[in-house]
């Protein structure tokens, strides 16, 4: 519910079950959005700035697939080198932190977490029914896992462009 589909650019799969009119070229960046409408904008922006993606998944209300599931999948995906997340909430924060810490050692995770302001928290809650997490706890989770937190989608893609095209230390 509340999602807009998925996209996999692997030539062996080549699956597009989104509502997006266009999508970015094949590449090594995996993306996920908890917001369907924002997902379409993310795909369009990635196409405009020519960031190649390996896969894109819209999670919506996370009724079937969560960020935990996606991180586990992308951890073993040879087509994915960088992971981008747009999150409105965490389903199981401890499990998410444990998985993200491990995955982030091999593949950088860059995240935009909505709901930093009170208005943003209300919007996220009304959109997917997700409870907003406390900002202090969210910031601590990102620090402890080593994920890179960005404030805007533009910053998210700037970080992704750098990491997708430069060897990691």
What are these regions (language model features)?
Residues 1-169:
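Catalytic-core regions of core metabolic enzymes
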